[in-house]
């Protein structure tokens, strides 16, 4: 009961407050620790003057910064690590320890609070990502496998939809226009075949390479008729007729038109054009239905964006509440509350010693404040033991 004896109290307080009781190294260490506490109110003391922990959240990722002070601190630089391991240019290859120049070049006169603040600013400017081999952080909505929960890119499942063309009329289009428009819309630009009279209206031969296989997969393949190696009809012609055929294109084309293979190709072409026109008409009938479904998809996509934004805000709020209710934060609050109750009890004792309060009032109020102080300290110590025991086998609380 030193508070009952003013001389003993004043002597003990002067001895404790005298800087002569601490070495210059210890005084500098205490100043750096106070700088750290003043700069970051949410920091938690894991072990007095040895280990501190600062949780923070960036991009829905909660990270703990662990600050370990070696025995010869501040002559030795502090060891700053993070959990879970992250990928960042200020971290080592394993993503555990901070390799910032401010930490590497730490001296006795460095400001530890400003160093941690600069580290947080850099994390906010360039957000880190979880290391691929790291375990998930023990929160309810932690993203598995270290994958970011919300990618910043958009939703690529909606292809651009071309505006409908007005006054489209399939019957008014010629075959050449239909083929040219289809080629322009769905394939790359190809060299135009040379025009030689009636040959320009004939279909191009279907290639037999990989492009032919891809066309067949879509159900639009066409097999060319077999071309014979010899034409018996030409053996009946004279040399002069063959010469005229070689020199005159019209005669050569007439001979070609008599070939059964070419007649089959022309017939197949006409059938194919009719099928294309019929399919185009059916597609036009589906235009209004597709427009309605497209608008429905766009409306649902807009609703999805709104729900995504609301979910992200709630997730951020959940992480903030989770941090405020974490074991480290509760321990820090209990410590502050116990210190406040102790100061209030000391003030009550000083008022009693100065004769400002009666003994009955003093006993009631002092006993109440002291009981609160000891209860809070006991809870704080018990919580510290639970955190220390849990950190040995599990992730930090």
Curated annotation (Swiss-Prot):
Modified residues (Phosphoserine): 18
Coiled coil region boundaries: none
Chief place where the protein resides: membrane
Gene3D superfamilies according to UniProt: Helix hairpin bin, Ubiquitin Conjugating Enzyme
Membrane topology value: Peripheral membrane protein
Ribonucleoprotein recorded as keyword: no
Compartment(s): Late endosome membrane; Nucleus
Entry keyword set: Endosome, Membrane, Nucleus, Phosphoprotein, Protein transport, Transport
VPS37 C-terminal domain span: 308-397
Single Gene Ontology BP annotation: protein transport
Subunit note: Component of the ESCRT-I complex (endosomal sorting complex required for transport I) which consists of TSG101, VPS28, a VPS37 protein (VPS37A to -D) and MVB12A or MVB12B in a 1:1:1:1 stoichiometry. Interacts with TSG101, VPS28 and HGS. Component of an ESCRT-I complex (endosomal sorting complex required for transport I) which consists of TSG101, VPS28, VPS37A and UBAP1 in a 1:1:1:1 stoichiometry.
Protein's UniProt name: Vacuolar protein sorting-associated protein 37A
Naturally occurring in which organism (per UniProt): Mus musculus (Mouse)
Lineage per the UniProt record: Eukaryota, Metazoa, Chordata, Craniata, Vertebrata
Gene name in the database record: Vps37a
